[in-house]
């Protein structure tokens, strides 16, 4: 059985704690743009009739639900997350949706995905790879569970390149966001968010990590001036 590191356990505990306010704060702090980003990311997936899609770090199921909305009824979706509280909330959302029969969710970390090799047509992870302590291992697992020519789609925060926009972004992300997040939830969690984004690799560096575990045909898309990035790779 995979054991989280001490850092991983702290991150897991943090997400368990903020789970009840997670969706609300996502909408508030991103001004609702996160929904647009997820829609764009899901448009990049690949699947065959009757295929399966895996959403890693599924949280409360936003991406899993978006996948269901964009794909035929023959497609089944599995969501996994290392936070039990997030998964429980996600199950409630899914059960209240029109897609309950197509989506299943379970607790599992990215570094030890509990499915056989070559099980899925595509794998997605949105705003989650940044929180995986052993990113290379997480990416290896995502690569492993893909079918041949399967596609990985990764949505993650990034740092804008334009100087003025970057300055405004840093002010909001480092000064404003933790305060607003702290008013409604846990301050330390929303202090962790910008810190983790600042230390995340650049787009080219991250694509090199993906290539290192076997992904090919790599590309990325900058969204909203580079605030977020979608990475696409194939097995």
Swiss-Prot record:
GO biological process entries: menaquinone biosynthetic process; methylation
Pathways involved: Quinol/quinone metabolism; menaquinone biosynthesis; menaquinol from 1,4-dihydroxy-2-naphthoate: step 2/2; Cofactor biosynthesis; ubiquinone biosynthesis
Protein keywords: Menaquinone biosynthesis, Methyltransferase, S-adenosyl-L-methionine, Transferase, Ubiquinone biosynthesis
GO molecular function: 2-methoxy-6-polyprenyl-1,4-benzoquinol methyltransferase activity; demethylmenaquinone methyltransferase activity
InterPro entries in the cross-refs: SAM-dependent_MTases_sf, UbiE/COQ5_MeTrFase, UbiE/COQ5_MeTrFase_CS
UniProt feature coiled coil, ranges: none
EC numbers for this chain: 2.1.1.163, 2.1.1.201
Pfam families per the UniProt record, alphabetical: Ubie_methyltran (PF01209)
Residues holding S-adenosyl-L-methionine: 60, 81
Entries under PROSITE patterns matching the protein: SAM_MT_UBIE, UBIE_1
Family statement drawn from the similarity comment of this UniProt entry: Belongs to the class I-like SAM-binding methyltransferase superfamily. MenG/UbiE family.
Reported function: Methyltransferase required for the conversion of demethylmenaquinol (DMKH2) to menaquinol (MKH2) and the conversion of 2-polyprenyl-6-methoxy-1,4-benzoquinol (DDMQH2) to 2-polyprenyl-3-methyl-6-methoxy-1,4-benzoquinol (DMQH2).
PANTHER family: 2-METHOXY-6-POLYPRENYL-1,4-BENZOQUINOL METHYLASE, MITOCHONDRIAL (PTHR43591:SF24), METHYLTRANSFERASE (PTHR43591)
NCBIfam families: MenG_MenH_UbiE, PRK00216.1-5
Name the record gives this protein: Ubiquinone/menaquinone biosynthesis C-methyltransferase UbiE
Source organism of this protein record: Geotalea uraniireducens (strain Rf4)
Gene that encodes it: ubiE
């Amino acid at each position: 059985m995979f054991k989280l590191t001490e850092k991983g356990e702290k991150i897991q505990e943090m997400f368990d704690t903020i789970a009840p306010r997670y969706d609300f704060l996502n909408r508030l702090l991103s001004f609702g743009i996160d929904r647009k980003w997820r829609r764009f990311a899901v448009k990049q997936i690949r699947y065959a009739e009757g295929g399966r899609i895996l959403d890693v770090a599924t949280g409360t199921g936003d991406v899993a639900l978006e996948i269901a909305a964009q794909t035929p009824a023959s497609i089944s979706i599995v969501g996994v997350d290392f936070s039990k509280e997030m998964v429980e909330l996600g199950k409630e959302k899914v059960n209240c949706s029109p897609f309950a029969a197509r989506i299943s969710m379970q607790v599992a970390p990215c570094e030890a995905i509990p499915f056989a090799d070559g099980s899925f047509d595509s794998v997605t992870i949105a705003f989650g790879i940044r929180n995986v302590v052993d990113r290379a291992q997480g990416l290896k697992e995502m690569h492993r569970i893909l079918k041949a020519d399967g596609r990985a789609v990764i949505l993650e925060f990034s740092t804008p390149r334009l100087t003025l926009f970057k300055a405004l972004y840093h002010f909001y992300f480092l000064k404003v966001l933790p305060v607003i997040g702290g008013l409604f939830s846990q301050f330390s969690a929303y202090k962790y968010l910008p810190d983790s984004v600042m230390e995340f690799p650049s787009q080219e560096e991250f694509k090199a990590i993906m290539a290192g575990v076997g992904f090919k045909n790599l590309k990325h898309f900058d969204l909203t001036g580079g605030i977020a990035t979608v990475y696409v790779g194939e097995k």
